[in-house]
A protein has these predicted regions:
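Flexible, compositionally biased loop and terminal segments
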Residues: 1-240
Length: 240
């Protein structure tokens, strides 16, 4: 096993390339998504192995609703299957399941399963697995600002406007207690952030790989971690 002196506390991955992976094999796109979810299980075990505390994955974006209805229905079924059959395994490994994103457009039964999974695993403390479903970075910021407005945080006792601070917005994000991603990996050779963790990624390091998500394995993870270990994170400052 490779050992690292510096490990990201929060690793995030854009799970990209499932459809193209399936197409190259002459299979339906949903076969790629199914294989991608299987790989999520394998990668989660690696997260524990390498001592990464927070692991978030971009599973379904706010823009993914524009995909064909059959594909969306298939993805929702896969999410149900994952929660029904894999949550107990994650919990047994010390993992806490959490979700980020809006829930008003998701099927009611899926939302119920998500809430139950969060409740069942809330006392696990080895690592957090964060599934971003119906998540969009812009939407998250809008929701945070609207929460501040509806909560009266933008009005003082005299009725005058009170400026919003970074701390205010941070405290109203979907998961305000989760640290910002240290390293964001995007698979499949695309070079875009795609609306993922927009607020939280201001000083995240990025690692891009041509490998499709279903083929992402331990060797690829090690490459990303080695790259991260060699980064000089200055956060806008300079070395003395």
């Amino acid at each position: 096993m490779d050992r690292f002196e510096i490990i990201p506390a929060h690793l995030a991955i854009v799970l990209d390339g499932n459809g193209r992976w399936a197409k190259e094999r002459g299979w339906p796109r949903l076969m790629g998504h199914r294989s991608g979810l299987r790989n999520l299980e394998a990668t989660t075990k690696l997260i524990k192995k390498y001592g990464i505390r927070y692991f978030s994955v971009y599973a379904f974006s706010t823009e993914n609703w524009n995909r064909p209805f059959k594909e969306i229905e298939g993805l929702m079924s896969f999410f149900r299957h994952y929660i029904r059959n894999k949550v107990s395994k994650v919990y047994a490994d010390g993992g806490r399941i959490r979700f980020a994103g809006r829930r008003d457009r998701l099927p009611n039964d899926l939302v119920k399963m998500m809430v139950e999974a969060e409740e069942r695993t809330k006392d696990a403390d080895i690592f957090d697995l964060i599934l971003c479903i119906d998540y969009g970075g812009r939407t998250e910021i809008i929701d945070a600002v609207n929460s501040l407005i509806s909560g009266g945080k933008t009005l003082g006792g005299d009725g005058k406007f009170v400026p919003i601070s970074e701390t205010d917005i941070r405290g109203n994000l979907y998961l305000p207690d989760v640290p910002d991603p240290d390293l964001i990996i995007r698979t499949s050779g695309e070079f875009r952030t795609s609306n993922f963790w927009l607020w939280e990624s201001s000083y995240s390091e990025y690692y891009f790989t041509d490998v499709y998500w279903p083929d992402f394995n331990e060797a690829e993870l090690v490459k990303a971690l080695k790259s991260y270990e060699g980064r000089d994170r200055r956060y806008g400052s300079v070395k003395k």
